[in-house]
Amino acid sequence: MVFLFTGCFKPSASLTFIKKTTLPEALGSRVPPESEDVELDALTEKSLVRYGSLIRHYSDRYQMDWRLVLAVIRQESRFQHDAVSHKGAYGLMQIMPETQVELLDKIGVEEATSPRNNIRAGVFHLRSLYRYFDEAVGDDRVQFILAAYNAGLGRIRDAQAIAKYLGHDPNSWRYVKDALPLLSKRYYTLHRQVWPEGKPRSGYFGNYRQTVNYVENIMQYYSDYKLALN
């Protein structure tokens, strides 16, 4: 499926907590006593007012942590609803145009350009990926779905295959992350030992650093949001 096996590539975005704030009433959220001194940056605060209810709604529908979704949006588009990448991905969650067919089949969305549908499509995609990594647990599982959202499920599956061939746990992000560089064409001799066809099933992959940074950035945002938002 195109929606699951293709990914998107985005520049890194830093998150700085610079302004102490109470949470928007629209979210129905409260800061727990132990997190009273945690501060949200102004960009996140403003975006929560605009999109918080949609993020919460579709995260609840598809059983995802809304703070993780918030972290993904921060990394993907910096909360810009009209963001467009050089690959054609668009919106808050940077949905690729070729995902439209599956969107129609799975959730009945005719377009994913509006903030509502873009968020819905993105959260649905995250949940779909979540099901593919049921043997990973905790943060490993989260990191797998983030990597697949960025690089495509197929590439992460290929990296898992290499990790397994090398005798490592294919459900540990630590080892799969280390296997991503080995998807480069320069390791063709290794590929011949892993796959009968002699190369990764989703093709060669040379931009592993971007995917690793992508995952690390979102995990940091997610950690910060879990402290600041309840």
Predicted regions and their residues:
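Extracytoplasmic
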Residues: 50, 64-69, 74, 87-90, ...
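Substrate-binding/active-site groove segments that recognize
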Residues: 86-107, 117-126, 218
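Second-shell loop/turn segments in exported
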Residues: 38-45, 55-60, 81-89, 105-116, ...
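Short, functionally critical alpha-helical segments immediately adjacent to catalytic or ligand/cofactor-binding
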Residues: 63-80, 122-123, 145-151, 218
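Short glycine/serine- and small hydrophobic-enriched flexible loop segments
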Residues: 57-60, 124-131, 220
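Catalytic and substrate-binding regions of cell-wall glycan-acting enzymes that process beta-1,4-linked
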Residues: 25-26, 145-226
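Secretory-pathway/luminal and periplasmic proteins that interact with or process carbohydrate-rich
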Residues: 77-86, 129-132, 151-165
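N-terminal export signals and maturation junctions of secreted/periplasmic proteins
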Residues: 3-57, 81, 228
